[in-house]
Amino acid sequence: MRNNFFLLCLIFQGVIAQERDALLEGLFEDEMSIEQQVLPQKMIFTQSVLWGKNGLFRKTGISKLSIAQRQKELKVRNVMLKTHQIIGYLTLAGMVAQGIMGGRLYNGDYKLYDTHKTMGEWVTASYFTGAGLSLFAPPPLVRKKIKGLNSIKAHKWLAYIHFSGMIATNAWSKEDRDWHKYAAYTTFASYATAILVFKF
């Protein structure tokens, strides 16, 4: 009888322990759903590395994942993307000036070479600063999937072209004048179009 009572107590303890474990698991599942609510399902690689669930800022404790912290991150995102936009306009103006000077250089006005070179360095720096602000900004709460072509998709596709073009323009600046010119025109056209698609 005593052995039966001991066995019954042991079984009862096992049942209580399982219920307690199930309750704790439920709590952790709720925490996971909070993480899923504050981070989008998909992020670009650069955002994931910094701002993802296991990103650098989470691991180092710079930006712990919570609803309050995500609200702060969204404010940072807003500032970064507005700055990206302003730098984008300045870069476009610099590209126009570069195109004018470049055309004069091709027509034999070599006194503009140093100015063109210096302006090219400034345009390159502003371009990659603006790109960095976009690529490293905290992710949005939700990434909306929109079927078909829209201004955001067009802006991103054009970014592949002008990003590659900017690298090619700089790579060919001393190597091949013709390819430098073609890369610069391609970069300018795709960059200007990427800005215009957001306006219309």
Predicted regions and their residues:
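Low-complexity, compositionally biased segments
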Residues: 6-7, 24, 33, 119, ...
